[in-house]
């Protein structure tokens, strides 16, 4: 166990941390750890080890770590829906799927307008049951984290899966490589990371935010929220006060709702 190191950039960050907090290494041995999701009812955490094609599970009750699923179709991001089921973004499956508590799998979306998705990356579930996900090309760019293949869609979009019909609609089409995403606490805004700098010189390395329409089915124009100062943003979540906690190249960055970088872990 190691004492956490904090960089305080704004007094608002001081109210979010405690001096006796520790960072604890839960597991080592992944080639590439990604996409954590916590099951509060079962007190366990799952995450992807993408190149090793497996999902791992850490049990909070006894501190043990085990393989949750292997092979795993190179899963990337995950979230838990309102019924406590695992929603998965599959690189090799090129789909968004749902895994029930009994282990059964249902493909929720694998095509848009008759064309295969690229390689879904991250997903969030809205309170109305709709699933919103990003679809960059990372899983089809090479065989390292999926199966190399050309993009049938020819672009990287953000999509919504309708909870009643299952229809897949594009809600944002002006991102280079959409990545992590999360709703504001009132679900009136959707924050989306763009990691296009991995493929385009001086490309995007930021989070943008878009207003959700009144009917909850579409987005307005996405505006710049924050630019990553070290590395790239990837996955992130909001706390109950609307602060964003996001991965970055030198740790976890915390942003206030107004877009100010207030601190780092």
Language model features by range: what are they?
Residues 15, 40-70:
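Beta-propeller domains
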Residues 22-27, 63-69, 106-113, 167-172, ...:
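A short beta-strand motif characteristic of beta-propeller blades
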Residues 50, 91, 136-138, 195-197, ...:
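Short loop/turn segments immediately following the C-termini of beta-strands
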């Amino acid at each position: 166990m190691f004492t956490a190191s904090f960089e305080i950039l704004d007094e608002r960050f001081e109210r979010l941390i405690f001096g006796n907090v520790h960072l604890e290494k839960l597991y080592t041995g992944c080639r590439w750890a990604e996409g954590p999701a916590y099951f509060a009812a079962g007190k366990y955490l799952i995450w992807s080890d993408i190149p090793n094609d497996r999902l791992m599970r850490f049990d909070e009750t006894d501190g043990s770590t085990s393989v949750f699923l292997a092979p795993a179709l190179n899963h990337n991001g995950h979230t838990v829906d309102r019924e406590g089921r695992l929603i998965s973004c599959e690189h090799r499956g090129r789909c968004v799927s749902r895994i029930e508590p009994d282990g059964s799998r249902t493909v929720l979306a694998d095509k848009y307008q008759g064309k295969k998705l690229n390689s879904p990356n991250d997903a969030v579930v809205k309170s109305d049951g709709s699933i919103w996900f990003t679809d960059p090309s990372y899983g089809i760019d090479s065989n390292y984290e999926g199966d190399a293949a050309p993009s049938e869609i020819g672009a990287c979009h953000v999509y919504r899966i309708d909870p009643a019909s299952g229809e897949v609609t594009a809600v944002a089409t002006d991102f280079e490589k959409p990545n992590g995403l999360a709703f504001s606490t009132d679900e009136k805004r959707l924050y989306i990371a763009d990691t296009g700098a991995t493929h385009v010189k001086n490309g995007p390395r930021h989070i943008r935010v878009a207003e959700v329409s009144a009917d909850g089915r579409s987005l307005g124009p996405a505006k710049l929220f924050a630019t990553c100062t070290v590395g790239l943003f990837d996955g992130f979540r909001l706390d109950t006060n609307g602060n964003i906690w996001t991965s970055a190249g030198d740790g976890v960055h915390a942003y206030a709702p107004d877009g100010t970088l207030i601190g780092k872990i």
